[in-house]
């Protein structure tokens, strides 16, 4: 089966080459999710062409025009659509580029990231004209995106979803608002990279420092302030909190780092660097509050990345996280700063070898049962059933 996969996903090295020196590099979670799905489809025998609208803006790329080009990366052909990096024109240009590419590309099916509305609208429109199936990847409800909503964007994404013939969703709760016509769908939660090298059941520790880490959007809605305050309150001896990525909380965070040298802010980093840091850490924390409505509609992809590292995970009891995951993580029951402080102290009171085994079991679980080869095969089966 020949599949055109329309999104902003770039090959990892191509992405790094374009953005590694940019002070405002695009978010990498969507990049990683789509790239893993693309690679999984290809490894399962599909002939995949990634139809990519590179995520450039006036603030992260000085070039006003990027020409189209195609490159082969392993089993995947990346077709980078041309970019006219001019506000007010860029989105229309991307839509037309994706439309033409898919319309005349000869694919058997289209898969698209519906939240990347410009490339998705072009791709799904071309698929409908060619009477080909189009699967929409829905990783968030457009109305509830924590990064902000634009009503025109919400309406366009809703229109794209209506045009799709099936869906890939992260939680069962998403099905009702996304799929009122009861079209075929699969739940994949998140994707674990099948190429990850498993960590040993008990790690070799070369430092007495207890290194905590958070890598995600720095937003109070994500519980970051409560986490930082909780870490400071916990006052665990010989402990550090390392924080990556960016967001509106960054100014306040930098003030905290001046008062508390063991809170260390690294800024934006490429995902490979973040993953290496996760492997080297002693505890990975996800403080996302459970009361926010969006949490029941999305699986925390950060938890998947955390669990895949083999490092133990401390997370809130998110409604979008199925029960089968919870035996592999430590849970924050009280999401206040005081509650997070208690959870951190309780976790570090656990024998280190036991914490290591918890992290090892989590990695084994996601590598064996939630890897991108297994999950993408389910998507391919849905397409082949049409």
Language-model regions, residue ranges each:
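A charged, aromatic-enriched C-terminal amphipathic alpha-helix characteristic of glycosyltransferases
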Residues: 335, 352-384
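Conserved acidic donor-binding segment of nucleotide-sugar-dependent glycosyltransferases
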Residues: 329-338, 345-352
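Donor nucleotide-sugar binding/catalytic pocket of nucleotide-sugar-dependent glycosyltransferases
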Residues: 143, 157-199
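Nucleotide-activated donor-binding/catalytic signature segment of Leloir-type glycosyltransferases, i.e.
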Residues: 251-278, 283
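N-terminal subdomain of nucleotide-sugar transferases
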Residues: 1-63, 166, 229-234, 318
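Conserved donor-binding/catalytic core segment of Leloir-type glycosyltransferases
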Residues: 2-6, 168, 204-231, 242
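Membrane-proximal helix-turn-helix segments that form the acceptor-binding/catalytic region
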Residues: 34-39, 99-104, 118, 125-129, ...
């Amino acid at each position: 089966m020949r599949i055109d996969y329309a999104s902003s996903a770039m090959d990892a090295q191509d992405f790094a080459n374009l953005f590694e020196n940019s002070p405002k590099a695009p978010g990498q979670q969507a990049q990683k999710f789509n790239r893993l799905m693309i690679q999984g489809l290809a490894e399962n025998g599909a002939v995949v062409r990634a139809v990519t609208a590179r995520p450039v803006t006036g603030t992260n790329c000085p070039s006003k025009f990027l020409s189209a080009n195609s490159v082969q990366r392993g089993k995947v052909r990346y077709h980078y659509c041309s970019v006219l990096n001019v506000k007010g024109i860029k989105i229309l240009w991307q839509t037309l580029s994706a439309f033409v590419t898919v319309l005349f590309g000869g694919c058997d099916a289209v898969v698209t990231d519906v939240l990347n509305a410009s490339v998705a609208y072009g791709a799904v429109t071309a698929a409908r004209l060619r009477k080909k199936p189009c699967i929409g990847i829905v990783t968030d409800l457009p109305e509830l995106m924590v990064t902000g909503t634009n009503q025109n964007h919400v309406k366009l994404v809703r229109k794209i979803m209506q045009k799709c013939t099936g869906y890939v969703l992260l939680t069962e709760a998403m099905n009702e608002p996304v799929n009122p016509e009861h079209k075929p769908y699969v739940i994949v939660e998140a994707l674990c990279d099948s190429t990850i090298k498993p960590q040993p059941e008990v790690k070799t520790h070369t430092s007495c420092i207890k290194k905590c880490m958070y890598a995600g959007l720095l937003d109070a809605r994500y519980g970051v302030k409560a986490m930082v305050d909780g870490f400071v309150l916990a006052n665990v001896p010989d402990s550090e909190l390392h924080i990556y990525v960016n967001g509106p909380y960054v100014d306040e965070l930098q003030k905290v780092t001046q008062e508390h040298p063991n809170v260390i802010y690294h800024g934006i980093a490429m995902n490979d660097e973040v993953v290496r840091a996760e492997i080297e850490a002693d505890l990975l924390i996800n403080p996302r509050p459970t009361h926010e409505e969006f949490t029941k509609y999305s699986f925390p992809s950060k938890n998947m990345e955390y669990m895949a590292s083999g490092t133990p995970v401390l997370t809130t009891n998110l409604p979008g996280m199925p029960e089968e995951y919870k035996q592999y993580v430590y849970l924050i029951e009280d999401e206040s700063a005081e509650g997070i402080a208690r959870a951190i102290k309780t976790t570090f009171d656990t024998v280190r070898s036991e914490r290591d085994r918890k992290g090892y079991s989590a990695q084994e679980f996601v590598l064996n049962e939630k890897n991108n080869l297994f999950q993408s095969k389910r998507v391919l089966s849905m397409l082949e059933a049409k």
